[in-house]
Amino acid sequence: MPAASLIQRLNAQINREFYSSHLCLHLSAWCAQHSLTGSANFLRSQAQNNVTHMMRVFNFMKQSGGMPSVGTMPPPKCECLNLEELFQQTLDDYYLRHDTLSGLKEEARAANAVKVESFLLSLSKEQDRDGKMLVAILEQVKEAKRAGLCMNQADRKLLALIERCH
């Protein structure tokens, strides 16, 4: 079983992924409310990815003899006025999860917890793909804004990008 501090940090990662899923669903609802179907669908897919990451950590902890714990959380704040703010919020959240996961990998390496480190490396690779997609989407949104496109037009361009990448 991993050290108590690693168990605590793994539980924090579970809850971080859970929050991110909740955030993506909340932002997806905002997009749907503004008839931004492509972005809404993408964010629902991202929410599912985050739940999958959460469950992977949960299952790893159980298999390693730890006791996973999912806490409660307040609803995320969504005060977005446009797609750029919305996708910046998702990217900021990704960076927070990425940094947390990187710190956890370092702690596992320092503790010589090889199984934990190996597991976290595979999880990190999955998250890196998500991060690259979010960066590409945000760049596409900024490009659409510079071109003077409205949110619905930008959303259609995003849908084409997302379909190419998935």
Residue map of PLM features:
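Iron-associated oxidoreductase/ferritin-like identity signal
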Residues: 1-166
